[in-house]
């Protein structure tokens, strides 16, 4: 029997949440969906898997869906986890469930965890909080009990067909602080930054995941300030503060 943490986590939040959940289940192997060199994986019926993704506009990020299809289960129990920046996760959980069930997994639990927005950081700033992690610990205990029996597949909210998947171009900008170290080139989940010119970003390939901004040691990369401001103002109007996590 083996336990796995599976995550797509451009800015690190989803990875932290998944790994925190995994601490309740002992030793875990990690599978990082953001790696372009990700290998195929096969899991057995006696294994257990926690899979987490951020919600991108109410959907599973497209590249995460592609890489989840490299993982095969054999009626392997799985826990689904979605992080979102305080607006809504819409069809993300149900899409994640559909994708993973099609790969041979039985989804015995799920959670939608509120997190600091990866672009408009003032939205749900500081989350997940200590209280959020306490809630996750409490639910992890319930999931452990479910694993002892013949747990039924969980139902999660969302619509089929899913809402249209859209990528909001962030027009990533690079300042003169860039040293050409290549951290962004290596880390980009979709290979949108050319090695020979790391100050460039291929806007047709970029998924606006903000990973390059997060990993830059010089803080030289940023989203277009006008677009960041526009997103921030819109979210301030539509997001309710201190949104509750949801567990299923």
Predicted feature residues:
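FMN-binding flavodoxin-like domain, especially the glycine-rich phosphate-binding loop
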Residues: 2-17, 21-169, 225-248
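Charge-patterned, long linear interaction tracts outside catalytic cores
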Residues: 164-186
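Short hydrophobic alpha-helical module
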Residues: 139-146, 181, 187-191
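Short secondary-structure boundary micro-motifs
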Residues: 156, 161, 176-177, 189
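Iron-sulfur cluster-binding cysteine motifs and their immediate structural context
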Residues: 174, 183-207, 211-228
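Charged, low-complexity surface patches
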Residues: 88-89, 177, 205
């Amino acid at each position: 029997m083996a336990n796995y943490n599976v995550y797509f986590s451009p800015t690190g939040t989803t990875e932290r949440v998944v790994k925190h959940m995994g601490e309740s289940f002992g030793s875990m192997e990690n599978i990082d969906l953001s790696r372009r060199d990700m290998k195929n994986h096969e899991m057995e019926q006696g294994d257990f898997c926690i899979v987490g993704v951020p919600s991108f506009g109410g959907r599973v990020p497209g590249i995460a869906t592609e890489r989840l299809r490299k993982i095969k289960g054999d009626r392997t129990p799985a826990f689904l986890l979605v992080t979102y920046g305080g607006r809504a996760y819409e069809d993300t959980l149900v899409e994640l469930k559909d994708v993973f069930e099609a790969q041979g997994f039985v989804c015995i639990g799920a959670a939608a965890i509120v997190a600091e927005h990866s672009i408009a950081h003032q939205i749900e700033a500081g989350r997940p909080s200590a209280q959020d992690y306490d809630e996750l610990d409490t639910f992890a205990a319930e999931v452990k009990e479910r694993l002892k029996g013949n747990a039924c597949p969980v139902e999660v909210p969302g619509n089929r067909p899913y809402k249209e998947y859209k990528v909001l171009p962030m027009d990533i900008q690079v300042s003169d602080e860039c040293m050409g170290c290549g951290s962004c080139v290596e880390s980009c989940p979709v290979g949108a930054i050319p090695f020979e010119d790391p100050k460039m970003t291929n806007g047709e390939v970029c998924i606006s995941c903000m990973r390059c901004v997060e990993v830059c040691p010089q803080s030289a990369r940023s989203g277009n300030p006008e677009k960041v401001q526009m997103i921030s103002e819109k979210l301030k109007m539509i997001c309710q503060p201190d949104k509750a996590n949801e567990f299923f």
